[in-house]
Amino acid sequence: MSRKQLALFEPTLVVQALKEAVKKLNPQAQWRNPVMFIVWIGSLLTTCISIAMASGAMPGNALFSAAISGWLWVTVLFANFAEALAEGRSKAQANSLKGVKKTAFARKLREPKYGAAADKVPADQLRKGDIVLVEAGDIIPCDGEVIEGGASVDESAITGESAPVIRESGGDFASVTGGTRILSDWLVIECSVNPGETFLDRMIAMVEGAQRRKTPNEIALTILLIALTIVFLLATATLWPFSAWGGNAVSVTVLVALLVCLIPTTIGGLLSAIGVAGMSRMLGANVIATSGRAVEAAGDVDVLLLDKTGTITLGNRQASEFIPAQGVDEKTLADAAQLASLADETPEGRSIVILAKQRFNLRERDVQSLHATFVPFTAQSRMSGINIDNRMIRKGSVDAIRRHVEANGGHFPADVDQKVDQVARQGATPLVVVEGSRVLGVIALKDIVKGGIKERFAQLRKMDIKTVMITGDNRLTAAAIAAEAGVDDFLAEATPEAKLALIRQYQAESRLVAMTGDGTNDAPALAQADVAVAMNSGTQAAKEAGNMVALDSNPTKLIEVVHIGKQMLMTRGSLTTFSIANDVAKYFAIIPAAFAATYPQLNALNIMRLHSPDSAILSAVIFNALIIVFLIPLALKGVSYKPLTASAMLRRNLWIYGLGGLLVPFIGIKVIDLLLTVCGLV
């Protein structure tokens, strides 16, 4: 789900942005943007010259100089407005998040258990390690981990999803977020952060972007723009002595106008807005990025590691068949499989219990009355089970059970290997059940590949992005699902260590890797990946290791994140191309007008046949200001994005924004010149 999008020019935001644009006229704010700082200095200088001319202290056309000065100030204001509007949209999103924060009291427990004595304290005084009790109707006062209990939680204020989620102690669903509301039951929570450090606080700070740091590409582009500005500044400075030597010195006002039209003011004025808008579009997709660097890295990603369950498949694997080993009847296998799954609360575990009940009327046993020891699943052991009445029953992956059988002096039957291969080739996941060292048979778990996912992977392939499916299934099952889904590669029987090693392998080949994760065991790989999208429903460790958080915990958001990142880079590149290309038309407008009196041969460059030198210069300056406003929607929304290879994308952008950048100014400056002439303003 995506959040409700603000209108591009929301009236209240526009009014606020106009006020902020005026406030940003102070030198301290302008200094942060070197290109626009030069325009600001030029505006100040021409204003002083206009006043001097009007008072008679300097010779010259005061009205013309004032017009140039006015439009230079408008140029600065438009650039400020673009940045302020982008920031205003982000702050509006942040304000919606601030509404989630409520001044509340918390019940701080004196002992870490339900029923212990509690003290009522303000929620903002809770510290890391404090234990609190929340019950139905309460707002969770802090980020933390559930240490006891289970409850239905409404997280819509943060995720935008209306469906409640279950939070309970143990496993990967123990993490809770401050500001969410308990709908039923109760939870005992251990606070994991101090005041001001909650996930909501960090979300608000990131969205507001008050301290937004420039990304590496943004810094590199800024350096390029500064270099171009210095070159044009030096070139303009040398033109005055040339014109003076020719006997007709060009005025300082004209030189300032020439400089402003030569330097890349269009991209200089929109650069900050593009960066802020990229972060804002991420939030619109229900993804919080910790920095602009993360969004930018998403645009450069060329390897996607995608979890099979929930991303490629629907993620609701269900037990579909019991396949007994030779000499074992199906009911015996079903009984053992059900016993091994009684404490397994995963959808797969519950489906095994239900299938045994449906096939053989095997009722669920009372867990407490069994006096059994349950063995939980771990990423290392890759199996789970039960120890009961001297019986040791396990279910798990083929390799894990094979090692278990051999460690207990048994032999893995060849007929079970054949059954495992048969299940795997059908795209189902085989789970093997063993009692002691005797293999009882195979459980087939069937999942379904999501509709349309193959076409999405084909689009990613067009963009030269490699897709890798990560799964705990064996190689045969993984290969069958990978072929059906259309991924480029897969990692079967994946462990946390294997995922980490795979990421490092791709990074050693100078590739940028993106992945998703939600569990504590995903944290090392998330920390290593260049773009790491943690699920909001995941553990605190996973969210801290990632550089993005999918608020609605949808793992397919990784593909959307890459699209948004690429769109931001394309927008920046396209507008840079347009900005530099449209300078060419300004050369043909201003240079003949400024120097034709000194060097009549330059009249040959007046291919637009502009009315007069004054109208030519003023038209170019006006166009230079107005083009910033016309490009603000493009900077905020991003350029139209299509899945293409890098070379095809470059050709497309050169045609649209390079050629467009050449033609639009010729038309625009000529139209403005005609209007000025018709209205008798020059």
Curated annotation (Swiss-Prot):
Keywords: ATP-binding, Cell inner membrane, Cell membrane, Ion transport, Magnesium, Membrane, Metal-binding, Nucleotide-binding, Phosphoprotein, Potassium, Potassium transport, Translocase, Transmembrane, Transmembrane helix, Transport. Disulfide bonds: none annotated. The keyword Iron does not apply. GO terms for molecular function: ATP binding; ATP hydrolysis activity; magnesium ion binding; P-type potassium transmembrane transporter activity. It holds the Pfam family E1-E2_ATPase. InterPro entries: ATPase_P-typ_cyto_dom_N, ATPase_P-typ_P_site, ATPase_P-typ_TM_dom_sf, ATPase_P-typ_transduc_dom_A_sf, HAD-like_sf, HAD_sf, P-type_ATPase_bsu_IA, P_typ_ATPase. The chain crosses the membrane at residues 34-54, 62-82, 219-239, 254-274, 588-608, 616-636, 656-676. Its EC number is 7.2.2.6. Its main location: membrane. The active site is at 307 (4-aspartylphosphate intermediate). Signal peptide: none annotated. It is an enzyme of class 7 (translocase). Mg(2+) binds at residues 518, 522. It is found in: Cell inner membrane. One of its GO terms (cellular component) is plasma membrane. It comes from the Bacteria. ATP binds at residues 344, 348, 377-384, 395. It catalyses: K(+)(out) + ATP + H2O = K(+)(in) + ADP + phosphate + H(+). It is a multi-pass membrane protein. Belongs to the cation transport ATPase (P-type) (TC 3.A.3) family. Type IA subfamily. Part of the high-affinity ATP-driven potassium transport (or Kdp) system, which catalyzes the hydrolysis of ATP coupled with the electrogenic transport of potassium into the cytoplasm. This subunit is responsible for energy coupling to the transport system and for the release of the potassium ions to the cytoplasm. The system is composed of three essential subunits: KdpA, KdpB and KdpC. This is Potassium-transporting ATPase ATP-binding subunit. The lineage of its organism: Bacteria, Pseudomonadati, Pseudomonadota, Gammaproteobacteria, Enterobacterales. The gene is kdpB.
